[in-house]
Structures are given as structure tokens and as C-alpha cells.
């Protein structure tokens, strides 16, 4: 016997299905479900009088044949698709994406539910991969809570705490600091990788940092990003299969942008804040996003371009780079980095896929808890100003924005993971990867997640009063969960190491409790591997007006006066 119900009734019961559309938060972005992996009439749902009961949707099978956890009827948004499915987790990893249930009585089951299976209700929820923030100044450990509760589950960068060098540069310099920071990372429910200091013209002091556990090296102008240092650093990276990130020479002291590009010698490099307000050759560092070997990212204070963007940057610069407002040269240095024309162009270069990643620059001209939020604000602003992308349809119902959404979600998930050699572990919702997953109510998408899973276990959640009779009474705020406690923390999160450090037994020598994973495959990555974000335009910047032209097209847009995902979400 079959029962027909309306689409609305179905969506309210089991979540949206193929062809249904969902608005993301209060933006203009609409996604359409491309495929539903569940089977109509055989959906599983937990609760009184529902499906997942003994002998019904739950089988009698032992745990070895069943998922540890199933997220039911979830709307997955990832770079590879926007689909409805059940998600099975096993041993902290994603085991299957498909149809959950009891194969003894149900057809098409690919994820077995048994007595040993926990259920997370995904009906009406969106699931994304945990974010990967690759521009972290480890100034204070409290950043980790802020990042985790925003949906970021991996942090890559450098620092040693509130030291002057760390305020300005993402470097954990030298073997001693790397050892101590890796030991400190054991205490936090976050995947973490550290970058050593890459500014040196001889390889010895750089190589020893990789051997001590750094997963890459950071070149920063405050330490001297000279052509010699760039060349040496990239040579060490090639020898060790690690990545290099660079903040180039704003003052053009040791050469202009052409000299820096020449020093790259075609080798892969991750350019931080490639627009330049965060630092880099003034006024035309933005040119490098057209190079095939350059993997360009933005930091979030310029995302998106608004009426307030320019005003806040000067004070941020003075603090972060240890400048003195009484020195005219320091003021000139700061002002040279803040250009409305290149910031406006950055919006468009993101929308067209020339800028491949987005990160925070935490407490050093960026906000660690706003990577995801500002990514989607940028996507909204570009749709509002530029209309639909060529890859998105426009029909009688107004069409959808699936391609644009895939482009933007890739900027803080899979592309930074590919860039830093960790995409075999994290960065997407794919079978075999670490189960770092974020669940959102659509109305709060990109702003306030409901659950954050680390390694298949809930690490943080928006939770009500712990003394209440039910979980929902106020005050509801983010609270650490069991994956953030005791021995579970070490098994639920990763510390990333270089291959040479892993082979040398660094984890055992340092006494690390956390699960370790190695970075690999960084040196062969090119812009072409940046998913949905691989455009390589030829860019020129007018040295007088700062106007940006890409492949003959003038890139300009107005600053936003009002944004979604803003004050209405943060009244309490």
C-alpha cells in the first residue's frame, strides 16, 4: 500500500528531497537537492512510533557489521554535490553515504543500523564538512573554541602565544617551539598543523623545523621575504613535500612583484591575503592569482567589501605590525596596503573562481570565528550585484545557486585541504575521511551551527541549561561535549606532521597523545587542482588609480551597505 503526501508534508517529516529548494540563512542563495539517496517509503527516522526500532529499521546485527553513528536524511552541501542521504560513521571516519536501515526487511540498504548504532536526526538539517582555516596566528588558545563553534575543525598556521612575532607572523620558529606547541595541541579538540619560519637563505635552519614537526614553512615580510629567502624556502619544501605560505614584500624593498614571481621559479606556493590589504607587494600583489603555480587565498577582514572595510583597516595594521602612529613612514606603510579598488576586485575574483581559498588571519587583522560567515556573505553580495553565475539555471521558479554554492564551500573546505596536503584526511564529506562534520539548521546556516562532530563524536553543540528538564531551555550557548574531554579528545582530533617528522618518531619522542597524520602531495598541486576555483586570468593594476583589469575586464563593484547573516543573528 502506498500513501501520497504533499512535498511540504514530506519535507517537514523527512527533510527536502530531489527538486526541493532551500534558502541558506537570510541570504539570496538558494540550493536545490540534486539527488536523494534514500528510498521513498523506506526512510529511517528515530523516535517514539517511528522507524528505527528493533525488528523494523534496526537490525539484529553486531557492531562489526553496523555503523557506529548514522546521521539520517541529511542535506549534504559539499564541493561534489548537494544531495539528500543518510551518512554512516565508523571508527571515527565516514563509512558510507547512502541509504540506512535494516537490510533484513528493507531494500537498497547500504548502511546497516543495529543495536550498537547511535542516531543523529538530520531531517531538515544541512551537513557540511568541517572548515579548514589555513591562516592562523596562534596568539591565544581561546581562538580554538571560537573557531570550533563556528564550524571550523582544522587550523593551520603558526605562533607561540602573545609574542610580538606571533602578533604579526604565522610562524612557530625552531624545533623547541614546535615541540612545545605540538604538546599544547594535545589539549584541544581541533585538528592542528604548525608552520615553521621560512625566512632564511640557507636550508639547514629551515629543514630542521620540518624534521621537528612543522607541516610547512611561512615566509613573511616582517622577517624579510627576499628573493633569496623565497628560493631557499621553496627548495626545502620541494625536498620535504611540504607547503610554503607567503606574505610578500609590501614596501617592494627587495624587488617588485615580478621579482617575487621569478623567485618562485614555477614552484607551488600558497599566497596569503592575495589582494594585499593584509600585506604584500603594493599595489599589485593581486596579479599573482593568475599564475598556475600560485594557490591564492583571502583573509576575512576584506570579505566582503563594505562601507566599513577601509576605515577599520588602518588601526588593525598599526597594532598587528608593531607600527608607530607618530612615525610618518609607518603611516605611509599602512596606507599603501589599503586600496578600495583592489578590495572591490577581490570580491569579483572570488566569484569568478580566481581566488581559491578563504581564511581568517586570526587576531592579526582577521576574525577566527567568521571564516564561514564571511564566505557566504561574499557569495550573497556577488549574487545581489552580479546576478547568477553561468553555471546556475534560471527558471520559472527563479532557479538555484548550486554552482555558486559549491564554488564558495570549496574555498574553506577542500581547497585549503588540497593545498596543505591533508585532503586525504579532511576537507570534504567523502568515504574514508575523518568524520569532521557540521550540522546546521538552514535558517542559521553559516552563522551558528547546531552540532560540531570531530572524528565521529560530538565535540561542541548549542546546548541549553544543563539543569533543565529538557535540553532546549535558555540560556542556549556553545558548550564543550564529550569529544572534547579526556582520552576521547586525543582519539577524535588530529595533529598533522611532516613525513620526515613522522618517520623520525617525533610523536613518541614528544609524548604526544593525539592521533597524528602526515601531510603529503603538496608539491605537485597547481591552480588547476583548486576545485571550482581554478581561473587563471591575466591581471594588470594601474599604479596610479589602482584599477584592476582581468583578461581585459575592469573589475569593480560597490561596497555593501547592508549584509545578511549579521546583526539579526547576534542580538543574544
From Swiss-Prot:
GO molecular function: nickel cation binding; urease activity
Pathway terms, separated by semicolons: Nitrogen metabolism; urea degradation; CO(2) and NH(3) from urea (urease route): step 1/1
Binding site for Ni(2+) 1: 135, 137, 218, 361
Active site: residue positions: 321
Name of the protein in question: Urease subunit alpha
Modified residues (N6-carboxylysine): 218
The Urease domain, residue ranges: 130-572
Subcellular localization(s) per the UniProt record: Cytoplasm
Necessary cofactors: Ni cation
One GO BP: urea catabolic process
Family classification: Belongs to the metallo-dependent hydrolases superfamily. Urease alpha subunit family.
UniProt subunit comment: Heterotrimer of UreA (gamma), UreB (beta) and UreC (alpha) subunits. Three heterotrimers associate to form the active enzyme.
An example Gene Ontology CC term for this record: cytoplasm
InterPro entries: Amidohydro-rel, Metal-dep_hydrolase_composite, Metal_Hydrolase, Urease_alpha_N_dom, Urease_alpha_subunit, Urease_AS, Urease_asu, Urease_asu_c
Enzyme Commission number(s) of this protein: 3.5.1.5
Source species of the chain: Ralstonia nicotianae (strain ATCC BAA-1114 / GMI1000)
Reaction equations catalysed: urea + 2 H2O + H(+) = hydrogencarbonate + 2 NH4(+)
Entry note: cofactor: Binds 2 nickel ions per subunit.
Post-translational modification: Carboxylation allows a single lysine to coordinate two nickel ions.
Keyword Repeat applies: no
UniProt keyword annotations, A-Z: Cytoplasm, Hydrolase, Metal-binding, Nickel
Amino acid at each position: 500500500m502506498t500513501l501520497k503526501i504533499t512535498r511540504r508534508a514530506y519535507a517537514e517529516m523527512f527533510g527536502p528531497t530531489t527538486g526541493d529548494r532551500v534558502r541558506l540563512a537570510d541570504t539570496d542563495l538558494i540550493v536545490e537537492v540534486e539527488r536523494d539517496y534514500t528510498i521513498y517509503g523506506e526512510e529511517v527516522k528515530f523516535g517514539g512510533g517511528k522507524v528505527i526500532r528493533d525488528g523494523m529499521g534496526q537490525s539484529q546485527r553486531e557492531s562489526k557489521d553496523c555503523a557506529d553513528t548514522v546521521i539520517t536524511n541529511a542535506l549534504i552541501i559539499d564541493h561534489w554535490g548537494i544531495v539528500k542521504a543518510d551518512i554512516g560513521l565508523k571508527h571515527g571516519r565516514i563509512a558510507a553515504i547512502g541509504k540506512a536501515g535494516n537490510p533484513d526487511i528493507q531494500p537498497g540498504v547500504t548502511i546497516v543500523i543495529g543495536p550498537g548504532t547511535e542516531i543523529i536526526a538530520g531531517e531538515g538539517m544541512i551537513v557540511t564538512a568541517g572548515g579548514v582555516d589555513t591562516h592562523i596566528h596562534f596568539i591565544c588558545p581561546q581562538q580554538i573554541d571560537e573557531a570550533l563553534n563556528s564550524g571550523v575543525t582544522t587550523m593551520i598556521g603558526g605562533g607561540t602565544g602573545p609574542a610580538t612575532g606571533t602578533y604579526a607572523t604565522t610562524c612557530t620558529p625552531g624545533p623547541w617551539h614546535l615541540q612545545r606547541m605540538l604538546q599544547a595541541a594535545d589539549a584541544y579538540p581541533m585538528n592542528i598543523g604548525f608552520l615553521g619560519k621560512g625566512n632564511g637563505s640557507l636550508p639547514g635552519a629551515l629543514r630542521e623545523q620540518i624534521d621537528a614537526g612543522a607541516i610547512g614553512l611561512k615566509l613573511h615580510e616582517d622577517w624579510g621575504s627576499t628573493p633569496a629567502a623565497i628560493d631557499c624556502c621553496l627548495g626545502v619544501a620541494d625536498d620535504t613535500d611540504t607547503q610554503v605560505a607567503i606574505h610578500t614584500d609590501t614596501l617592494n624593498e627587495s624587488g617588485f612583484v615580478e621579482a617575487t614571481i621569478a623567485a618562485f621559479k614555477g614552484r607551488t606556493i600558497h599566497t596569503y591575503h592575495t589582494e594585499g590589504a593584509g600585506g604584500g607587494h603594493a599595489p599589485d600583489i593581486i596579479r599573482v592569482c593568475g599564475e598556475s603555480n600560485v594557490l591564492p587565498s583571502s583573509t576575512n577582514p576584506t570579505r566582503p567589501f563594505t562601507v566599513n572595510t577601509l576605515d577599520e583597516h588602518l588601526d588593525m595594521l598599526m597594532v598587528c605590525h608593531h607600527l608607530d602612529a607618530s612615525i610618518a613612514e609607518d603611516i605611509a606603510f599602512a596606507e599603501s596596503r589599503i586600496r578600495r579598488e583592489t578590495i572591490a576586485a577581490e570580491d569579483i575574483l572570488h566569484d569568478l573562481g580566481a581566488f581559491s581559498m578563504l581564511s581568517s588571519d586570526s587576531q592579526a587583522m582577521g576574525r577566527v570565528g567568521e571564516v564561514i560567515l564571511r564566505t557566504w556573505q561574499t557569495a550573497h553580495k556577488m549574487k545581489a550585484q552580479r546576478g547568477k553565475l553561468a553555471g546556475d539555471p534560471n527558471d520559472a521558479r527563479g532557479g538555484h545557486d548550486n554552482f555558486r554554492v559549491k564554488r564558495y564551500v570549496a574555498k574553506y573546505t577542500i581547497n585549503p585541504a588540497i593545498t596543505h596536503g591533508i585532503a586525504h584526511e579532511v576537507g570534504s564529506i567523502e568515504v574514508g575521511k575523518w568524520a569532521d562534520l557540521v550540522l546546521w539548521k538552514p535558517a542559521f546556516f553559516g552563522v551558528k551551527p547546531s552540532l560540531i562532530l570531530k572524528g565521529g563524536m560530538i565535540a561542541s553543540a548549542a546546548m541549553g541549561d544543563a539543569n533543565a528538564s529538557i535540553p532546549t531551555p535558555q540560556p542556549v550557548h556553545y558548550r564543550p561535549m564529550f569529544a572534547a574531554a579526556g582520552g576521547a579528545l586525543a582519539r577524535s582530533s588530529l595533529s598533522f606532521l611532516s613525513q620526515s617528522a613522522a618517520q623520525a618518531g617525533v610523536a613518541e619522542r614528544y609524548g604526544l597523545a593525539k592521533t597524528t597524520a602526515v601531510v603529503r602531495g603538496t608539491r605537485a598541486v597547481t591552480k588547476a587542482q583548486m576545485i571550482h576555483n581554478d581561473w587563471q586570468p591575466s591581471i594588470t593594476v594601474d599604479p596610479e588609480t589602482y584599477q584592476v583589469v582581468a583578461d581585459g575586464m575592469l573589475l569593480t563593484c560597490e561596497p555593501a551597505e547592508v549584509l545578511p547573516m549579521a546583526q539579526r543573528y547576534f542580538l543574544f
